[in-house]
Amino acid sequence: MSALKEFDALQKELKIYGWSGLFHYTDFTNFVNIMKRGALLSKHRAQKENLLRWEMNKREATVAMGVDLSEYTRFYYAPKTTMLYESEGVKAEEKGTAHMPVPVLLVFRKELVMNEDALFFDGDAENRNSFCYDNLAEARYKMDWQGVFSRFEQDPDDFYSARVRCAELLLPDEVALQGNLVAVVFRTMADLKNAQNIVGFNPLFMIDKTMFNNFKGWNNAGIGGNRRKNVYNYIMDYDIGIEGNTLEMHYSFASDELSRYAHEFKITYASGTTQVDDSDYDGNAVEWDLEEDIIRDEPFEVSYSINGHRLIYWYSDDWTGPRGV
């Protein structure tokens, strides 16, 4: 059967699961680099070009079944894999683990499975129990597609389901965005505004918080240990305006869990001058207002960070400096 016929058959079989594309989750800082580069790169290429800021997976092993995973771009078939529970969101107490502080979802066209160099792992590619198929026909027949798309509440000790949910498609080296990227999904309006402030308007940008875990994530006790769900806070939305020589900002958080984080509001002028406000939150509100006197005759950018991770990117109309750094 030709690759196209195999694809049509696979698409028909997976219709019951609502298969809508190939999913690549990454941190916002990586997303900016991907958009500016115009391509999704393998880990090796991204590191070589100094474009990889945060990694969703920091395991040392990069070789599986003789395949150097760092030489491939990697995609999931369904959203919210178990891997995301370990890495999504700004963690109140970071311990050097895998981290995706501000998650962004890039959705690529399904037809990429027809790439003649594609590799199909029936689970997490770095799991020693996963098997790799080098052709679409075999993957279509042998992979546990029901398990891949299952999103029922998972028993932490169910290693099989955890592995299979993370089934991956691997494509070598790089995948161009042009003609292949079909959607960019953000968790919040704040993330969408940040993206537009940096790379401009894009009709592919959308918001769908159901594609993320939002508050829900696991601590690092390990599968089968005494795990609990954490609350990872972030900015939901913000509005910034200027009245005379005063900058006014209204912003809201996803949770009132604020005191566990270090907060920094910062204005940076084109000359390099900065104004910093290290705010302490002792209330339980999620919506806040801030006013700051500014030097109005000089271009400036505004940032807001928690635990050192920037959650607001805003620029005055006359700003001509770099964006997204």
Residue ranges with predicted function:
Residues 1-74, 79-325:
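Active-site-proximal loop/hinge segments that shape catalytic or ion-binding/gating pockets
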